[in-house]
């Protein structure tokens, strides 16, 4: 069951944040006005985990922002955080599914909830950013008809992850 985040369940937001396997990278290319990509597989996969979010109450209290939590038997196994963006799109700031529930429809259900929220709030579509090394996420977005709209090679340049490339995905209604 998907529930909107409230003050009461806000503590559950970081529960689905678990490591994922990095087994390669996407290599985007822009040719004749169209983004395409190939993939490079690593000989030695590794695990990566994002830091927990410091969740602020604005996602409970303010219009133009929302977070939704996916529960199974009272356990939070998925989350999505979304807000209005300056360009008319709803920006998915974060989506996460606990590792034991990946590829079982939880992410798709959360994405459908984000689409519903964005349409109710009159956005032109969804957008998000992920890293080139998160191939599973990139496949997920492509499978759900998102297209690459931009690539940023400098976004992470001041961080230990400077070798990662930001890929911006769009889904227009």
Swiss-Prot record:
What is a biological process (GO) this protein takes part in? response to antibiotic
Q: Which InterPro entries match?
A: Acyl_CoA_acyltransferase, GNAT_dom, Streptothricin_AcTrfase, YpeA/RimI_acetyltransf
Protein's UniProt keywords contain Transferase: yes
User: Residue ranges of the N-acetyltransferase domain?
Assistant: 21-173
What does the UniProt record say this protein does?
Involved in resistance to streptothricin, a broad-spectrum antibiotic produced by streptomycetes. Detoxifies streptothricin via acetylation of the beta amino group of the first beta-lysyl moiety of streptothricin.
Q: What family does the database annotate?
A: Belongs to the acetyltransferase family. GNAT subfamily.
- Spell out the subunit comment: Homodimer.
Q: By what name is this protein known? A: Streptothricin acetyltransferase A
Species name: Bacillus subtilis (strain 168)
């Amino acid at each position: 069951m998907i529930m909107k985040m409230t003050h009461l369940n806000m503590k559950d937001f970081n529960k689905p944040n678990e490591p994922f396997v990095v087994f390669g990278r996407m290599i985007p290319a822009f040719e004749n006005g169209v983004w395409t990509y190939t993939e490079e597989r690593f000989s030695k996969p590794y695990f990566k985990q994002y830091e927990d979010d410091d969740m602020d109450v604005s996602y409970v209290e303010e219009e133009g922002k929302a977070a939704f939590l996916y529960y199974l038997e009272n356990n939070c196994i998925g989350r999505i955080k979304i807000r209005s963006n300056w360009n008319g799109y709803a920006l998915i700031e974060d989506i996460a599914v606990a590792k034991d529930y990946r590829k079982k429809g939880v992410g798709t259900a959360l994405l459908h909830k984000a689409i519903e929220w964005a349409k109710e709030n009159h956005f032109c579509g969804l957008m998000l950013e992920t890293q080139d090394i998160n191939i599973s996420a990139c496949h997920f977005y492509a499978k759900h008809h998102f297209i690459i709209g931009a690539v940023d090679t400098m976004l992470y340049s001041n961080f230990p992850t400077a070798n990662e490339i930001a890929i911006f995905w769009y889904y227009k209604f």
